[in-house]
Amino acid sequence: MTARRTRIKFCGLTSAAEVALAVEAGADAIGVIVADSPRRVTLDEAAGIALAVPPFMAKLGVVVDPPADLAVRLRSFGFTLQFSGDEPARVCETLAHGSAYVKAFHVDGAAEDASFERIEAYTHATPMFDTRVDGKAGGTGIPFLWRIVESIAKRRAVIVSGGLTPGNVGACVRALRPYAVDVRSGIETSGRKDIDKMRAFVRAVRDADAET
């Protein structure tokens, strides 16, 4: 019996050198942030990073309520769009231009948020669940209660983000069996990508996969 394989995305990459680290560690996808963030990159930088991503590795452009021209440019570089703001379904569907994309939904309570009921409206999206703390959505470094999205994860492919680290991602994979996991600060030391943490993160996911 073949073990399932959880996809792994390393987010917040800022250079071709960090892409090389992600490849070495065994990530399936990388993300660049073209929105307000300490790890924000310009469009020109995103284009350069895209050229460093090898074939068969996915690349995502993270945006927040983006203008149409930004979405068009990112798609022209080969990025799959990841909408991490309050974008309604019609906007995401229009800007993705019929292509698959990722839509972030933010978790800040002890039960499924009402916004989860609207997931089906995002026809071409894979939903990603991330943490919201004190009004800050994403980039908190704090995990949410995974049981909140357990029922959704049983029904469809989901991506889990928010406070994942080499120390807890295995438990997340065992609990939810998500399609993918997404990590940013959990593979960093002093704000920079750490190859040892990147390898440990991948190893923890693969160990959990093997227990299926």
Feature roles, as predicted:
Residues 1-212:
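Conserved N-terminal beta1-alpha1 strand-loop-helix module at the mouth
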